[in-house]
């Protein structure tokens, strides 16, 4: 697999806009994808750079993008995880709870910022813990594994101007252009359909420092069960410590926001 890096630059703005004085924060996840537009010439998938999604989930998104094309509407996909497979014992998490219609299409995503684990189920609070609402463990949530056609890039660019005109007035130093907001706009305007691809995969991420040992153990078991080779690349240590300036470093450069933006995996389809 060929790996290329796209850099999210503050000054990458439409004509007529300038970076506000004092702004250091990047423009958000939708803008991160826009930063990759010159590298994408077909369907593509988007993931969080520092999460583990499971092999089955990648196959699902690849299979979908291989056979689906836009028609009168954009045809997108999202892998939906069972809430119980995304929780931690070490504190609360934020999750996007999915509303799905009878045809398996996404209707909306409702963000809950404080969800806690309760056995095999969960509950969320919106009043700092004064009250909780139960959530079933098999509730479907979005973990930001999306599949898009190339046309999504045009829609991001189209909405970016409107975002800037409003955001720069109200919160010029911190406003962010989020990927889900673009999807929501297209769903609300009936321009897109998003197929929810259900998975029973376990999602792993280090939300809290205390999560790290559990995640390391889980990934080790996958290796021992031959899900993955023991060494994923020729020089694993060098790959892990390769900083974006192209210089080998002794420490992993987490301070760079690690493209906290999103990693974009471009899926080139062989249609011969």
Where are these regions (language model features)?
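Conserved N-terminal catalytic core of the sugar/cofactor nucleotidyltransferase
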Residues: 1-48, 53-60, 66-67, 249
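Catalytic beta-strand/loop signature of glycosyltransferases that borders the donor
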Residues: 140, 195-201
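Conserved core of the sugar-phosphate nucleotidyltransferase
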Residues: 55-145, 150
